[in-house]
Amino acid sequence: MNGRSYEVRTFGCQMNVHDSERLCGLLESAGYSPVDPGGEADVVVFNTCAVRENADNRLYGNLGQLVPVKKGHPGMQIAVGGCLAQKDRAAILDRAPWVDVVFGTHNLHRLPVLLERARHNAAAQVEIAEALEVFPSSLPTRRASHHSAWVSISVGCDNTCTFCIVPSLRGRERDRRPGDVLAEVEALVAEGALEITLLGQNVNSYGRSLGDPGAFAKLLAACGRVDGLERVRFTSPHPRDFTDDVIEAMATTSNVCHQLHMPLQSGSDTVLRRMRRSYRRDRFLGIVERVRAAMPDAAITTDIIVGFPGETEADFADTLDVVRAARFSGAFTFQYSPRPGTPAATMDAQVDRATVADRYTRLVALQDEISWAENRALVGRRVEVLVSEGEGRKDGATGRMSGRARDGRLVHFRADEAASSSTGSGPRAGGAAPAVAVAVAPTVRPGDVVETVVTRAAPHHLTADGPLRSHRATRAGDAWALGRDGDGGGAAAAQQPADGRPIVTLGIPSLRPSSPDPVGPASADAASAGADACCTPVRR
């Protein structure tokens, strides 16, 4: 240990969240330790997003708040990485000269060296690589959750959407070999993970660089053969590349969740053409129809941008029509904002802000109405919930706990009544496996699995205020308790050091004590969260 503490602050999408896990692993491998809650870190790292305009504002606002902190904290260092750093480079120092290190998306592994060099030379260090130097999955990683984990299957993107700057910042798509992906999945499950999310900018194009265009469906099926892996999710697919073999794999692989997040972006063929999205509304709705035919209980969510340059009222009406037809369980909705360096930023017919805001309000109102109706249909249904921490912001006040159903819906439930060990006979939602008689543990913990009955619905969540129908303690729950209390047990305990914090390993990463669950999309409006408009925002 070098005696210095660190904090990583993450803006943006799941890619950034997973990269931040790697930054934590790199720093801890270099001897840094996480700052204590409420403490003042010696090193603050910002992992930035460049997709939306307010991403810049959030970064520089946060950097400004650290000026007096740094003046009163001798030796403190500030580093800025991620997509905005890759884009703006040394210009960050022009706006925030108190920053010590700027690094990009292709050289995460250089952070500890750059911090040490900046300290030794007493001068800011800017190092931006033009291409990926080390595949990120080979880096040390400190996972954010004991029970859920991201697993990258590719990095970069070969699409050329006119509103998106990500390909120029993340590079062209590079795929991991299926054997490497499965080795990581198996290692995570051996440590107690119950759920993994396969991660890529466009998971449906996975395998092309390996000479196997059908590799993604095969990978899903292979995940179904991993003993102990209970839930498999993926994000994000692209409608252009979405094929029926993936639908079949989702429907026939028992641990693949019946949840699909598929970005629509617009329901107007004219706007989709200007966006260079390479599909049209009929193809999108055809995929939705085939998914629902194969999996009637599937929860389908999406991303939608309103106010794209040239969007007319008729174009917007087409989007509303698709939303009504698709009946999404939730949508991440965005007001278009031009990003320098993208073709859309210089297009004619930019839509005025008042019109964009009006359309956004109307879209959100329609989607909330649909989400609420879809959720009300689940009242009285039995759901299996993987318990998490940080999902329910009001859990402390309401006395509830929270987690995700198999279809990705957020469920707030009461855990203060004894769970029954009987199997029950009520209907189940989200494709949950039938309950079996279990020994009920006295305390429900993040990482455990419960079954409960939905008693109330809201547009963005379900509530279950009745007694639990079952509760299954898991090794992930044991590990959470160990990290919180310094005790615990089970096989998970054997993989923890004496202080209850999991180790950081190279290549096959380790899990981390409690932190907000990285599970993917559900009904929410994320426009104010500085989120990515082409990959699903993550809740923090």
UniProtKB/Swiss-Prot annotation:
NCBIfam families: miaB-methiolase, MiaB/RimO family radical SAM methylthiotransferase. It is found in: Cytoplasm. The lineage of its organism: Bacteria, Bacillati, Actinomycetota, Actinomycetes, Frankiales. It comes from Frankia casuarinae (strain DSM 45818 / CECT 9043 / HFP020203 / CcI3). GO terms for molecular function: 4 iron, 4 sulfur cluster binding; metal ion binding; N6-isopentenyladenosine methylthiotransferase activity. Residues 480-540 are annotated as: Disordered. It comes from the Bacteria. It catalyses: N(6)-dimethylallyladenosine(37) in tRNA + (sulfur carrier)-SH + AH2 + 2 S-adenosyl-L-methionine = 2-methylsulfanyl-N(6)-dimethylallyladenosine(37) in tRNA + (sulfur carrier)-H + 5'-deoxyadenosine + L-methionine + A + S-adenosyl-L-homocysteine + 2 H(+). Residues 4-120 form the MTTase N-terminal domain. Residues 143-374 form the Radical SAM core domain. The gene is miaB. Monomer. SUPFAM superfamilies: Radical SAM enzymes (SSF102114). Binds 2 [4Fe-4S] clusters. One cluster is coordinated with 3 cysteines and an exchangeable S-adenosyl-L-methionine. Catalyzes the methylthiolation of N6-(dimethylallyl)adenosine (i(6)A), leading to the formation of 2-methylthio-N6-(dimethylallyl)adenosine (ms(2)i(6)A) at position 37 in tRNAs that read codons beginning with uridine. [4Fe-4S] cluster 1 binds at residues 13, 49, 83. This is tRNA-2-methylthio-N(6)-dimethylallyladenosine synthase.
